[in-house]
Amino acid sequence: MSFTVTKTAPAVITPSEPTPSGHILPLSFFDRLPFLRVFLVDMIMVYGHGDQPAKVIKEAVAKALVHYYPLAGRLTTDTDDGELSVACTGEGVWFVEATADCRMEDVNYLQVEPLMIPKEQILPSHPEGVDPYTLPFMIQVTQFRCGGFTFATRANHAVFDGIGAGQIKVAIGEMARGLKHPTVKPVWCRDVIRKPIPSQISATEPHDTDLSSIPDLKFTNNQTNIECCSFDLSLDHINHLKDHFAKEVGKICSVFDVIAAKLWQSRTRAIGLQPQTEVSLTFLLNIRQVVLHNELPPDGGYYGNCLVPLINKAPSGQIANAPLFEIVRLIKEAKDDLLSKDSASLIGEMPPYKKPSYADLSIVDWRRLGLYEADFGWGGPMFLVPLNEHTVTSCSTYLFKSPVASKKDVRLVTYCIVKEHLEAFRDEMNDFT
């Protein structure tokens, strides 16, 4: 059964009050990294109900842009140094209003892939004749027959990271609920994160590994032969393993540490690479308080890119056979080591992009980005639907809050297993559900 989304005439939302204009704001070294400046991040947030959400959100965006006025500008390289920057033009944010001829439950709340409504119908499309990479932020609000709605965004990753996205969307929600100012005051200060001098750049080269036993991911039009699956992980069981780690090691670990260790081991066992083949687990660490500790107020506010990838590497046999607490220790020690470095060293730690292989795995924790706190007056989102990140990193996994409000469990969604390994992977993960 097919469903139709009807988009009304799009509009440009400008700040509701005069804002600084006519000047150029620099982006940081992180913001200007090549793989971020050409990365448009698509996200759908699913809400259960709302009264005229498009009207409310449109007005809230105009108010939020007074505080986040760079988002009303345009990305440009027409500067003295030719570097990517934000021109504060005040032109506004592209906003699309739409209606769907179905209920949320008819399309499974957009939780099953492939989506029952093509993502292009839910996401905002850029104006004809406009380069989408010049637009920092676009929005589409789609109302469903049941009263639910989606708040879908397309954002240029060069302007803000996941934490920044959460901060901005929370601010829009606060404006929608009648606040005069965002709870967290936005901070720009991109010039603090400068390009490192050559001596600060890590010279670490990728470790040689036996590629002959690693399956081809078969990239075709940004798609792979990777299967999608999800698990609802028991927080009681995770807390039991945290207690076991504390008893064995004498230190405290996080829910994330335990899930990441279990995921890495389960997948490594399921794919069955040669014991000496190197496998990796990558996740992002927020380094705001290290790099910007002299610039930020106590409540933060920096919304530029300030997440660095931490790549954990080990032989397949070690990860498959070690006690789980040892893998937790490996992950935790790597985090502690990275965060103990000084600002200059951290800025130089950004590894070059490389095409991922089946031996590589990444995990993103969407629970801690602030997105669940984006409340436009009717409560936070029921579901988050990231649409394109797994097509970039291939073997990706995501942590979400449980969709059942009364439960404290964690939902893990994975795009990291080919079909022939899926059953073994599920068997390994089942004792966490």
From Swiss-Prot:
Group of enzyme by EC: transferase
An example Gene Ontology molecular-function term: acyltransferase activity
Enzyme Commission code(s) on record: 2.3.1.-
Highest taxon, organism lineage: Eukaryota
Tissue: Expressed in young cromes.
Annotated catalytic residues: H157, D375
Keywords: Acyltransferase, Transferase
Metabolic or biological pathway, per its Swiss-Prot or TrEMBL entry: Flavonoid metabolism
Reactions catalysed, as given in the entry: myricetin 3-O-[beta-D-glucosyl-(1->2)-alpha-L-rhamnoside] + (E)-caffeoyl-CoA = myricetin 3-O-[(6-O-(E)-caffeoyl-beta-D-glucosyl)-(1->2)-alpha-L-rhamnoside] + CoA
Function: Caffeoyltransferase involved in montbretin A (MbA) biosynthesis. Catalyzes the caffeoylation of myricetin 3-O-beta-D-glucosyl 1,2-alpha-L-rhamnoside (MRG) to produce myricetin 3-O-(6'-O-caffeoyl)-beta-D-glucosyl 1,2-alpha-L-rhamnoside (mini-MbA), a precursor of MbA. Mini-MbA and MbA are potent inhibitors of human pancreatic alpha-amylase and are being developed as drug candidates to treat type-2 diabetes. In vitro, is able to catalyze the caffeoylation of quercetin 3-O-sophoroside (QGG), although QGG may not be a physiological substrate in vivo.
Family designation: Belongs to the plant acyltransferase family.
Protein name: Myricetin 3-O-glucosyl 1,2-rhamnoside 6'-O-caffeoyltransferase AT2
